[in-house]
Design a protein with these regions (language model features):
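Lipid interaction determinants
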Residues: 1-80, 92-285
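A short, structured loop/turn motif at beta-sheet edges
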Residues: 86-92
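Phosphoinositide-binding peripheral membrane targeting modules
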Residues: 83
């Protein structure tokens, strides 16, 4: 007779780091093993990027306005989010403050447990199972920032764990609000946009992942293909409440973006220009 084995629920310290997904499976038998999915978890702040395989080429794209209709439609199939992870004793909830897709009808909640060489996630509001695998990137240093750009009223996040980072910058335009629009996919907004510029604006939400090397903070994956191989160049400015990062203008010119730091988790010593700081959580509001 098979005995029930108590599930090992991970704590936040065990979740710290990079997780890759190998499978999502639904009760009707539909599975996905092809989508590239990485989830980077900090002390509570997280970022997540999901990209479909076999996209079009973007070799001639220097900025947002270079994207053609087919490229925009493919970009609209991506997913990604940034926010904070919470746990109520039963369910983990990935609260999304930035979402590449329009706001979902259902919350992003699920159970997590460790099973042999993987971590399993079981959805709460939507029935699914996901298999996650811890990637060896190192667990220190750790620094996470919640950001706000007052110049254009957009939110952002920066998270470093070990030798890897993820960065998010919200879009500058909102989605049309109506009861009929609830639950729509980004591809629907893109397909129904009044012109190509409006469609481009809908996909102009950056969620990037990269590696920290001797050459800098080099972007290796991004929802915006023209950001690939660029150096994020984060710099913490005195009095340690302002962060500057690289950006790309709509026409492909290199630019710098200034952020107000709203919240910090971890040590700012791992951010260029920063004074060493102990591992603490700070808030500037």
């Amino acid at each position: 007779m098979k005995q029930n084995v108590e599930r090992k629920i991970p704590d936040f310290d065990e979740l710290l780091g990079l997780w890759s997904r190998s499978l999502i499976a639904f009760p009707d038998g539909v599975e996905d093993r092809e989508t590239w999915v990485n989830w980077l978890q900090g002390p509570s702040i997280y970022l997540d990027l999901r990209q479909p395989p076999a996209g079009p080429t973007f070799h001639t794209v220097r900025g947002l306005r270079d994207l053609n209709e087919d490229q925009v439609l493919w970009l609209a199939e991506q997913e990604g989010f940034a926010g904070t992870l919470n746990f109520d004793g039963t369910y983990f909830e990935w609260r999304r403050e930035i979402d590449f897709q329009p706001e979902a009808i259902y919350s992003d909640q699920g159970k997590l447990w460790v099973e042999e060489d993987k971590m399993v996630e079981e959805g709460k509001d939507i029935p699914y199972f996901e298999h996650w695998h811890s990637e060896p990137i190192g667990r220190a240093p750790v620094c996470a920032m919640r950001l706000e750009s007052k110049a254009d009223q957009v939110r952002g996040f920066l998270l470093r764990v070990g030798s890897l980072f993820m960065y998010a910058r919200d879009r500058f335009v909102g989605f049309p609000e109506s009861d009929s629009a609830r639950g729509m996919h980004l591809r629907d907004y893109v397909a129904g946009a009044k012109d190509l510029h409006a469609a481009q604006d809908f996909v102009n939400c950056e969620i990037s992942q990269g590696a920290i090397t001797s050459a800098g903070w080099i972007i290796q994956r991004s929802t915006l293909p023209f950001r690939l191989a660029q150096n994020l160049m984060p710099e913490l400015l005195a009095p340690a409440a302002t962060l500057v990062t690289s950006d790309t203008s709509h026409d492909g010119r290199q630019a710098r973006r200034s952020w107000d730091i709203i919240d910090i988790e971890g040590s700012t010593a791992c951010i260029p220009g920063a004074e060493p700081a102990r591992l603490v959580r700070q808030s500037f509001v």
